[in-house]
């Protein structure tokens, strides 16, 4: 089942990349908003509790695209780096010993959580900045 999930996500990612080439949005090639983040978050196997938290991360990431494109791009790149590291892990997992597997899986999971916290915070700061203008009236 896990291999089917990885295969589906790989095919889905390729389809998104190919279809987004026709878009004029400069972020469209890798940033299908919530779809992009959901794809990134689902790549690493996660507990049910973390799966629920990823929906908030996804919404915050979509909001951040509208609030601050520079931060959005920065966090998109961080998601990409985590994704690349995970695919390295998957390609080489048979060569790793038990401790290496556990360490790499743990670091990837922690980094993914950290990027989600950063995205949530940046979205909050962006909303606060917009509301501060209104509050200062």
From Swiss-Prot:
Keywords per UniProt: Lipoprotein, Membrane, Palmitate, Plasmid, Signal
Principal subcellular localisation of the protein: membrane
Location(s), subcellular: Membrane
Membrane topology: Lipid-anchor
Leader sequence residues: 1-21
Keyword Disulfide bond listed: no
Residues lipid-modified (N-palmitoyl cysteine): 22
Protein name according to UniProt: Uncharacterized protein YuaE
């Amino acid at each position: 089942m896990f291999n089917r999930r990885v295969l589906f996500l790989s095919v889905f990612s390729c389809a998104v990349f190919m279809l987004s080439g026709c878009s004029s949005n400069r972020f469209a090639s890798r940033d299908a908003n919530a779809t992009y983040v959901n794809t990134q978050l689902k790549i690493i196997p996660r507990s049910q509790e973390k799966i629920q938290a990823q929906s908030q991360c996804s919404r915050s990431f979509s909001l951040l695209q509208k609030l601050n494109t520079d931060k959005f791009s920065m966090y998109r790149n961080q998601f990409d780096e985590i994704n690349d590291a995970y695919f390295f892990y998957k390609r080489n997992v048979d060569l790793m010993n038990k401790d290496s597997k556990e360490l790499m899986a743990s670091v990837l999971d922690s980094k993914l959580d950290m990027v989600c916290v950063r995205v949530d915070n940046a979205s909050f700061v962006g909303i606060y900045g917009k509301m501060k203008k209104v509050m200062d009236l």
